[in-house]
């Protein structure tokens, strides 16, 4: 197959992190299967994909000019995609920009979804909520298929089940993992990697937990002092945005990595979080507060599960503390959890779905 992989206005710092790594792995594995793949990215600034097609637009201006610039960039990108003559287009869902709807005239489009976009944009602002509600069907409506990272999202995003859907949870390339040695901390160190403005990460919960147990260090990566409200205790370290090597350095000193702690705020209960998978492949025990699509039935001592509720962290604070102490000096047995996360198996499933979609269009 000749595949056009399309992303629209993903922030460069996101493309330098786990999302970019995920996209790079997709492209690498698809090419290993003999498919021709090119990434086409509409972006406000350069992203670390020098070998791919980037279409920059100036976002540092007033609203009208910015949207005009974005539309101009979108037209240039769609022209390039059309000239590429793909058999199929894999579009990572993003907020609609004119004239994105024309992408469906080029080739069958499979939409890659990653969250409940309706609730996500509701939390950003009334403007973005209604902009997304009024335009999202321009992307989903004509789509030839949808890929979802969870079964829960299928019911939310394709409620009528009127088009082909494939559930492919996020995974990892097991040929490219590195188990970090367990640190020799005097007291436990917990780490959460997130992005400011996303309340479902539950950073506020960890801060309250830190106040209860001042001997435990809490690393919060991605958040700076201006990104949190209220007092922050001395045992909470706000690292701000870090590049991938800097994140790895923080994780190297971590006893327990925290997954998203407040998915309920986004009306979600199931996920396959990239940061949880990254931590596991570094060998770091994890705290999970949601139903993991791959790991929900896996019972190992290095995974602690708590309910997906507003009071989950404080209600289970003692259990979390005990788990953190118990995990000091321990690492995850990747031979047990790895087979559930194998990206190569997942990409075989995704590519087979592409073939199914194309067969249905003939």
Language-model region placement:
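Donor nucleotide-sugar binding/catalytic pocket of nucleotide-sugar-dependent glycosyltransferases
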Residues: 136-179
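Nucleotide-sugar-dependent
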Residues: 14-20, 197-201, 245-249, 259-281, ...
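Active-site proximal beta-strand in glycosyltransferases
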Residues: 3, 104-121
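Short His-centered aromatic/hydrophobic patch
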Residues: 91-96, 113
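Conserved catalytic-core segment of nucleotide-activated headgroup transferases in glycan assembly
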Residues: 19-29, 173-176, 189-231, 238-248
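Membrane-proximal helix-turn-helix segments that form the acceptor-binding/catalytic region
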Residues: 25, 74-79, 98, 111, ...
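A charged, aromatic-enriched C-terminal amphipathic alpha-helix characteristic of glycosyltransferases
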Residues: 307-318, 324-359
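N-terminal subdomain of nucleotide-sugar transferases
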Residues: 1-46, 208-213, 217
């Amino acid at each position: 197959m000749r595949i056009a992989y399309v992303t629209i206005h993903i922030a460069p710092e996101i493309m330098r992190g786990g999302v970019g790594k995920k996209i790079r792995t997709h492209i690498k594995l698809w090419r290993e299967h003999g498919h021709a793949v090119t990434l086409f990215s509409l972006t406000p600034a350069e992203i670390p994909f020098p070998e791919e097609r980037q279409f920059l637009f100036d976002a540092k201006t007033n609203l009208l000019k910015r949207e005009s610039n974005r539309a101009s960039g979108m037209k240039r990108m769609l022209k390039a995609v059309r000239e590429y003559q793909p058999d199929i287009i894999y579009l990572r869902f993003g907020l609609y920009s004119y004239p994105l709807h024309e992408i469906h005239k080029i080739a069958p489009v499979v939409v890659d979804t990653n969250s409940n976009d309706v609730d996500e944009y509701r939390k950003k602002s009334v403007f973005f909520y209604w902009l997304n509600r009024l335009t999202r069907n321009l992307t989903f409506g004509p789509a030839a298929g949808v890929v979802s990272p969870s079964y829960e999202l299928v019911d939310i995003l394709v409620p009528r089940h009127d088009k082909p859907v494939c559930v492919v949870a996020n995974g990892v390339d097991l040929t490219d993992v590195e188990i970090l040695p367990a640190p020799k901390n005097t007291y436990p160190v917990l780490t959460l990697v997130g992005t400011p403005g996303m309340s479902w990460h539950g950073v506020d919960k960890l801060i309250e937990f830190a106040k209860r147990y001042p001997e435990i260090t809490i690393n919060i990566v991605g958040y700076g002092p201006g990104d949190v409200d209220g007092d922050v205790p001395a045992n909470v370290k706000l690292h701000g945005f870090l590049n991938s090597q800097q994140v790895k350095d923080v994780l190297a000193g971590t006893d327990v990595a925290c997954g998203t702690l407040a998915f309920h705020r986004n009306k979600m209960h199931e996920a396959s979080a990239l940061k949880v998978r990254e931590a596991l492949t570094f060998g770091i025990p994890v705290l999970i507060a949601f139903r993991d699509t791959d790991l929900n039935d896996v019972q190992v001592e290095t995974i602690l599960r708590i309910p997906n509720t507003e009071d989950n962290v404080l209600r289970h604070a003692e259990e979390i503390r005990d788990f953190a102490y118990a995990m000091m000096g321990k690492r995850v047995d990747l031979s047990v959890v790895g087979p559930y996360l194998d990206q190569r198996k997942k990409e075989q499933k995704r590519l087979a779905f592409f073939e199914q979609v194309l067969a249905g269009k003939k």
